[in-house]
Amino acid sequence: MSDTAISNQRDTAAFPEGGMGSARDFFELLKPRVMSLVIFTALVGIAVAPGGIHPVIAFTALLCIAVGAGASGALNMWYDADIDARMARTANRPIPAGRVTAREAAVFGSILSVFAVMTMGVLVNWVAAALLAFTIFFYLVVYTMWLKRRTPQNIVIGGAAGAFPPMIGWAAVTGSVSIEPFVLFLIIFMWTPPHFWALALYRSGDYEKVGVPMLPVVSGEKETRRQIMLYSLALVPVTLLPGFLGFAGALYMGATAALGAGFLWLAFGIWRTEPGAAQDKAAKRLFGYSILYLFLIFSLLLVEKMLGLGGTAFALAL
């Protein structure tokens, strides 16, 4: 591994200082594609939670979660602007491209963070607000500032930040947390490593160049393929827990098992390939499928709730 691959120091001179960007540039700071998945998983958390919630309160909660996720994205782009400037995939982001200054992004993200948390607390409840605040803190401080440039386990631990939205949604309805939202959290938490390591396999050169110790850079591609397979084997049983715990029914269990078989097949395809074009193709295939996979799993929970099909046929006697 090269010296650049173990550096964890920020180089704030690596990108140009621009002026006030357009509304589109500031919207891009929010990482809207990431935000859309966050909103959807939070919506499922709201939908499957017991009890009712006024539609206006539900909308407010989703808005706060979306703004909080966007704020996290803006603060992440502020802190990571130096490495974004040196990666082909991120070089055209607003800060490295000089359309928005780092200071503007930091102020923008901070204001949105405070707005999201305070609005959630005042208009929804303070349990959901506390979880939202912790999520923003975890993503910015624990993942972005501490783990990302220091350890190949950055995705494993830092992935918790992306797993909180359904728990926040649940808390917005109930004012508490329980085993059900924790299971939804666990699904996303276990999904994150194989999802991002698949990306890292065919982008490892970019990560090595900027000193981010992703698993392929530190431990090699063979170990990364092995870890993807192991985490995939752990993920599939976790996705079946909603049925065994009684808040998902036969539709969810059957479809999720089939989706899981597809995930395992693609993970196995990565595991048995050698470095090169075939590995990159297999990794891209799993990366793309993993996004659809998570979306469909949470969609199944939502559909069962809407159709009144969620049942206890598979529930364990706990």
Swiss-Prot record:
Gene Ontology cellular-component annotations: plasma membrane
Pathway listed: Porphyrin-containing compound metabolism; heme O biosynthesis; heme O from protoheme: step 1/1
GO terms of biological process kind: heme O biosynthetic process
Entries under Gene3D superfamilies matching the protein: UbiA prenyltransferase (1.10.357.140)
UniProt-listed InterPro entries: Protohaem_IX_farnesylTrfase, UbiA_prenyltransferase, UbiA_prenylTrfase_CS, UbiA_sf
Catalyzed reactions: heme b + (2E,6E)-farnesyl diphosphate + H2O = Fe(II)-heme o + diphosphate
Keyword hit for Hydrolase: no
Topology in the lipid bilayer: Multi-pass membrane protein
Enzyme class: transferase
Major localization class: membrane
Annotated compartments: Cell inner membrane
Transmembrane segments: 37-57, 58-78, 100-120, 122-142, 155-175, 182-202, 228-248, 251-271, 291-311
Statement: the UniProt record of this protein carries the keyword Cell membrane: yes
Gene Ontology MF: a single term: protoheme IX farnesyltransferase activity
EC number of this enzyme: 2.5.1.141
Alphabetically ordered keywords of this record: Cell inner membrane, Cell membrane, Heme biosynthesis, Membrane, Transferase, Transmembrane, Transmembrane helix
Pfam (any one): UbiA
Matches recorded under PANTHER family: 4-HYDROXYBENZOATE SOLANESYLTRANSFERASE, PROTOHEME IX FARNESYLTRANSFERASE, MITOCHONDRIAL
UniProt similarity note: Belongs to the UbiA prenyltransferase family. Protoheme IX farnesyltransferase subfamily.
Miscellaneous comment text of the record: Carbon 2 of the heme B porphyrin ring is defined according to the Fischer nomenclature.
HAMAP family: CyoE_CtaB (MF_00154)
Function field: Converts heme B (protoheme IX) to heme O by substitution of the vinyl group on carbon 2 of heme B porphyrin ring with a hydroxyethyl farnesyl side group.
Protein name from the UniProt record: Protoheme IX farnesyltransferase
Gene that produces this protein: ctaB
